[in-house]
């Protein structure tokens, strides 16, 4: 398995004697990891959580004196006020044989401040690309940040907290962006402190993402509290969380003594957090008591609260909460609304919706009444189905189901009657139950003569268990439409004599009744009926006697896949097909799925009827896919094709369905009884569209005239590539691999992210390994993938054990790209056999951005510039027919205009994001929030005013403003202007492109004749036809991209206006701006509505 993560080295050691002129340059100084990487790509000494300075406990002499001590001791968490007494940085390594955990998690701002006071090593990045190792600390009076060593005077090697304007997480300053070492610096380990009136930056890199988050959270807390008395000195005891835990403890403490039995405390914590193991809770109590030099079976209120906070606080969730809440210990309704809109991509969020979420997930009664969500409620919300990675819209039928049957991928099973391998496994009726419950819409019935004139199903390599044909039909009838109401295809393998064939017909008619679809196909039609029209119908696929013959029986070729396999294995196969006799009654049950033999595409396109279906062995289909990928795609636009596993797969292993989906093959039959990566892809793919078993293929595979090659390794014509940003944050409750031989439950997990799709999209990346942590391993690694054909892409998360013996597989989850939800999401992991594992999840952040315009609208309409300095234009091809080439030449200028407008808008948006210090995945609302924070003066009035000009929101200064603000306003104005040009010009340009497309399509039917007249034939004619399809595809695709870009621009303007109003930028002399802004929103909506109605 290829490793995607780059190898990283250890950070340079701290040089106490070095000054600012003694840089640590190179990759080792820029490393973003917390530990050196050992051979084989494995990380050693990587710990989860963050080690904090220890707190001295008060010893208890005896259990008898515990009650008195509990009443007398003040319940206050101590804070280290003198870091000079603590060991810091470069601690000597020791070997411990104790089973006690030695680390404490960050669970509050108090913990962040404590860590900062103790200090740690950070890398200081200078604008000249030099990097220095420095030891940073927070003053004991919390007024300044200091670093050493430095040649500067001690009073100069510091930064006053009061001078800090902003703290940015990530590489989001000019120093990082322009730094030659930027690519070697971990995004999640970098942060910047902007200070002074000119927003100068102090750019730093921590040794881990955890440490970076601690500094960012702590500094933001200090800055936000700079004008208020600092209350963190009281520790955690006055937080809403502590008050709630105190209430919980007191309710369980029936004696009111302030202590309870350890067993009771363990049970209470398990009730509050069912995911915790009892052994882990008991170990935590022992650790706390050991630190206080006491050993007892009773737990105080303080110990209970401390244990709960350490066990149940996920640092990554705490840092997220602090970031959202602007450094509070909870979220109010406004914070939650902002989180849902900005991070989660939810639209039309109201305060009532947020209060409802708080009421459902907040654990404390006080929080529910006052409308705030503390860390534990927020964690539960993030773990709830509402924050699942899978788009809820795709959990129901969401696609157009009125297109021809050949336009859909169909969930299909091979050897459905088997539950083990096909060579030795017995037949089992549960195979049908399982497949149908999984939404399978094409199943196999391999029928042979049975005793007593009763047809049977069996594995002819294992006759130990026989299934009566009738019993199988009854099971199918019972479960056929439980998971899906759309048509079920029965692939009939007929090996029966004529008398038993007639018994089969009688039984099918009796069991299925009017569900059997036997209507003769209409010769006036060109395509198969739709799934919508065939609801609750059972379609028989099989051989059929010629309709013009009056014979009651006749001879047909036998497509016996199992017999072919047996003959190949035994060496009896000579390439000749067998023939069988077929009765008229069974032939008449076959209507729109008549099995025919494939010859070649040229003959099929001329002679094959739309109701005829070809079956391809895996070997044949693979050869065709490699040699004739474009022809295979075009063939599948009209006809159904079925691909079944190779005859040599006697172990019932599975083929890779993606290889054949890329060619448009609708029915790719899988061995449902064999779990593994290939079955994971199949199962994940058919989760979409409500799991109904039918998935609409990409439009480029359905359009009559379009160009697409399954083997493409570049950009697809007419489709705008997208960038998928995946941050693997953490894992929860990873189990030990099922087949592991090692003793104990310790694992070293890492995560692989796989992208499956067309060859241009296939990719894989992996995280570093987290040592000996299965409960809450922190990965904090971000990956980026370019996706050229999103509609045909799958994302697979795989968790593996790096220190395995026997079995490395921990869990996986596979999801279609189109079903990904943006934002912070939990991935519910599945076992090797595909079952959801309770409480086992992967915490990730998902963002989808445009590469160069277009992309997804609404919740996924983010923007990013990832192109080359020289703009590339999609080129039209020369066909060699002057009349048609002249038409396409007219489209060249409109195409350039369309690409220019889209990319100009995207580039302007990216410029605003960069000046706001935000990453490309940030939303425009985040930009406006950042922008407004800099444009609000010290007396809380804006330095600019929102002014509406022709329904577009401009910002005008209300006096003299600093140069930094001038640059930001100039970038904002350019963004509005480019959006305006796109909105106002898009329809005109798109119409020109559409007219060229229509004019070109008028020659489609006569293309062969025109080519022949011009002397084109053979390969030249085929090339001309291919170029024509390419041009039509480009024109249609670019027209659609421009339309989508206009919709995105309109949505952006609405977001900007609403954000300006909500951020207070409408205040001041332009007091009527708010009302005017609302009117402009209505004007844009009315304009859009009238344009749409005009087109209709």
From Swiss-Prot:
Tissue expression profile of the protein: Expressed in brain. Found in the granular cell and Purkinje cell layers in the cerebellum; and in the hippocampal pyramidal cells, dentate granule cells and pyramidal granule cells of the cerebral cortex in the cerebrum.
Residues recorded as bearing Phosphoserine in the entry: 48, 78, 96, 570, 1080
Start and end residues of each PI-PLC Y-box domain: 586-702
Domain of life per record: Eukaryota
Residues carrying Phosphothreonine: 94, 557
Modifications the protein undergoes after translation, according to the UniProt entry: Phosphorylation of Thr-94 resulted in dissociation of PPP1C from PRIP1. In vitro, phosphorylated by the catalytic subunit of PKA.
Stretches for region Disordered: 1-101, 1067-1096
Region described as Interaction with PPP1C: spans on this chain: 83-222
Domain C2: 702-831
SMART domains (alphabetical): C2, PH, PLCXc, PLCYc
Keywords recorded for this protein, A-Z: Coiled coil, Cytoplasm, Phosphoprotein, Transducer
Subcellular location: Cytoplasm
Domain PI-PLC X-box per the UniProt entry, residue ranges: 399-543
GO MF assignments: GABA receptor binding; phosphatidylinositol-4,5-bisphosphate phospholipase C activity
InterPro entries: C2_dom, C2_domain_sf, EF-hand-dom_pair, PH-like_dom_sf, PH_domain, PI-PLC_fam, PLC-like_Pdiesterase_TIM-brl, PLC_EF-hand-like
PROSITE patterns hit by this protein: C2 (PS50004), PH_DOMAIN (PS50003), PIPLC_X_DOMAIN (PS50007), PIPLC_Y_DOMAIN (PS50008)
A Pfam family the protein falls into: PI-PLC-Y
Family statement drawn from the similarity comment of this UniProt entry: Belongs to the PRIP family.
Assembly information from the UniProt record: Interacts with PPP2CA, GABA receptor beta subunits, GABA receptor gamma-2 subunits. Interacts with Ins(1,4,5)P3, Ins(1,4,5,6)P4, GABARAP, and PPP1C. May form a ternary complex with GABA receptor beta subunit and GABARAP. The formation of a ternary complex with GABA receptor beta subunit and GABARAP could be the key step for facilitating the association of GABARAP with the GABA receptor gamma-2 subunit and to allow it to be transported at the right destination.
Record's protein name: Inactive phospholipase C-like protein 1
Organism whose genome encodes this protein: Rattus norvegicus (Rat)
């Amino acid at each position: 398995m290829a490793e995607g993560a780059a190898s990283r080295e250890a950070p340079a050691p701290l040089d106490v004697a070095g000054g600012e002129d003694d840089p640590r340059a190179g990759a080792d100084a820029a490393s973003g990891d917390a530990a050196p990487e050992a051979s084989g790509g494995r990380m050693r000494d990587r710990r989860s959580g963050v080690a904090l300075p220890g707190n001295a406990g008060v010893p208890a002499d005896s259990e008898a004196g515990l009650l008195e001590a509990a009443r007398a001791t003040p319940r206050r968490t101590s804070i280290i006020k003198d870091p000079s007494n603590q060991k810091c940085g470069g601690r000597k390594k020791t070997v411990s044989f104790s089973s006690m955990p030695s680390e404490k998690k960050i669970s509050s701002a108090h913990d962040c401040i404590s860590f900062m006071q103790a200090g740690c090593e950070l890398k200081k990045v200078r604008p000249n690309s030099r990097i220095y190792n420095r030891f940073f600390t927070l003053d004991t009076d919390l007024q300044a940040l200091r670093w050493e060593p430095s040649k500067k005077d001690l009073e100069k090697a510091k930064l006053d907290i009061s001078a800090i304007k902003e703290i940015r997480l990530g590489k989001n300053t000019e120093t990082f962006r322009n730094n030659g070492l930027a690519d070697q610096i971990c995004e999640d380990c970098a942060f910047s402190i902007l200070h002074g009136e000119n927003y100068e930056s102090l750019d730093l890199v921590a040794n881990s993402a955890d440490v970076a988050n601690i500094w960012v959270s702590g500094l933001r807390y200090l800055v936000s509290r700079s004008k208020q008395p600092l209350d963190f000195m009281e520790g955690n005891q006055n937080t809403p969380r502590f008050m709630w835990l105190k209430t919980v403890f007191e309710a369980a403490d029936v004696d009111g003594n302030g202590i309870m039995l350890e067993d009771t405390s363990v049970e209470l914590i398990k009730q509050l957090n069912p995911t915790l193991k009892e052994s882990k809770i008991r170990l935590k109590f022992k650790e706390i008591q050991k630190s206080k030099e006491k050993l007892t079976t009773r737990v105080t209120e303080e110990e209970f609260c401390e244990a709960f906070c350490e066990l149940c606080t996920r640092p990554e969730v705490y840092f997220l909460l602090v970031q959202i809440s602007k450094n509070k210990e909870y979220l109010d309704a406004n914070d939650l609304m902002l989180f849902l809109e900005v991070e989660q991509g939810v639209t039309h969020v109201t305060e009532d919706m947020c209060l409802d979420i708080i009421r459902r997930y907040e654990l404390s009664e006080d929080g529910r009444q006052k409308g705030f969500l503390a860390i534990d409620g927020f964690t539960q919300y993030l773990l709830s189905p509402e924050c699942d990675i899978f788009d809820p819209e795709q959990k129901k039928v969401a696609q157009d189901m009125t297109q021809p049957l050949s336009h859909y991928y169909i969930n299909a099973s091979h050897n459905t009657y088997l539950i083990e391998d096909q060579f030795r496994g017995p037949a089992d009726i549960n195979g049908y139950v399982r497949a149908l419950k999984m939404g399978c819409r094409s199943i196999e019935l391999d029928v042979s003569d049975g005793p007593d004139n009763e047809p049977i199903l069996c594995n002819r390599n294992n006759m130990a268990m026989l299934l009566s044909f009738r019993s199988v039909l009854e099971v199918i009838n019972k479960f056929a439409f439980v998971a899906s109401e759309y048509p079920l295809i029965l692939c009939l393998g007929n090996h029966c004599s004529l008398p038993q064939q007639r018994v089969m017909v009688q039984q099918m008619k009796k069991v299925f009744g009017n569900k059997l679809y036997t209507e003769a196909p209409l010769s006036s039609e060109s395509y198969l009926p739709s799934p919508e029209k065939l609801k609750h119908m059972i379609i028989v696929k099989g051989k059929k006697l010629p309709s013009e013959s009056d014979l009651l029986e006749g001879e047909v070729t036998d497509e016996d896949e199992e017999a072919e396999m047996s003959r190949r294995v035994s060496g009896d196969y000579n390439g000749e097909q067998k023939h069988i006799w077929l009765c008229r009654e069974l032939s008449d049950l076959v209507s729109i799925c008549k099995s025919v033999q494939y010859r070649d595409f040229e003959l099929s396109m001329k002679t094959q009827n739309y109701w005829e279906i070809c079956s391809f062995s895996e070997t044949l289909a693979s050869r065709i896919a490699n040699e004739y990928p474009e022809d295979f795609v075009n063939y599948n636009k009209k006809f159904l094709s079925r691909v079944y596993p190779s005859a040599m797969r006697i172990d019932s292993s599975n083929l890779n369905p993606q290889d054949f989906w890329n060619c448009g093959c609708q029915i790719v039959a899988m061995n449902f009884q064999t779990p593994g990566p290939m079955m994971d892809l199949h199962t994940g793919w058919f989760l979409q569209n409500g799991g109904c078993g039918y998935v609409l293929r990409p439009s480029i595979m359905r359009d009559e005239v379009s160009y697409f090659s399954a083997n493409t390794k570049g950009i697809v014509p007419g489709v705008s590539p997208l960038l998928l940003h995946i941050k693997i944050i953490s894992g929860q409750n990873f189990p030990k691999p099922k087949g592991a031989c090692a003793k104990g439950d310790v694992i070293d997990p890492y995560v692989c992210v796989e992208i499956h799709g067309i060859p241009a999209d296939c990719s894989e990346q992996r995280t570093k390994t987290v040592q000996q942590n299965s409960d809450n391993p922190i990965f904090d690694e971000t990956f980026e993938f370019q996706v050229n054909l999103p509609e045909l892409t799958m994302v697979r998360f795989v968790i593996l054990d790096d220190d395995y013996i026997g079995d490395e597989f921990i869990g996986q989850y596979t999801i279609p790209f189109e079903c990904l939800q943006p934002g912070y999401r939990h991935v519910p992991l599945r076992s090797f056999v595909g079952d959801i594992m309770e409480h086992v999840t992967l915490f990730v952040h998902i963002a989808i951005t445009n590469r160069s315009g277009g992309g997804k609208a609404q919740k996924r309409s983010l923007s990013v510039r990832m192109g080359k300095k020289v703009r590339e234009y999609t080129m039209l091809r020369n066909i060699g027919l002057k009349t048609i080439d002249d038409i396409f030449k007219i489209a060249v200028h409109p195409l350039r205009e369309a690409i220019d407008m889209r990319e100009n808008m995207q580039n302007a948006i990216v410029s605003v994001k960069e000046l706001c210090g935000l990453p490309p995945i940030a939303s425009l609302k985040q930009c406006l929030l950042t922008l407004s924070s800099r444009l609000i003066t010290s007396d809380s009035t804006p330095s600019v005013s929102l002014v509406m000009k022709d329904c577009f929101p401009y910002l005008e200064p209300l006096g003299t403003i600093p140069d930094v603000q001038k640059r930001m306003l100039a970038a904002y104005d350019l963004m509005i202007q480019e959006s305006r040009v796109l909105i106002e010009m898009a329809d005109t340009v798109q119409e020109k492109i559409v007219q060229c497309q229509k004019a070109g399509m008028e020659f489609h039917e006569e293309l062969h004749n025109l080519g022949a007249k011009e002397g084109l034939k053979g390969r030249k004619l085929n090339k001309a036809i291919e170029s024509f399809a390419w041009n039509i595809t480009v024109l249609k695709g670019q027209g659609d991209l421009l339309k989508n870009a206009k919709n995105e621009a309109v949505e952006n303007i609405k977001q900007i206006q609403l954000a300006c109003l909500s951020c207070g930028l409408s205040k001041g002399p332009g007091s009527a701006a708010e009302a005017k802004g609302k009117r402009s929103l209505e004007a844009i909506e009315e304009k859009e509505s009238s344009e749409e109605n005009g087109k209709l």
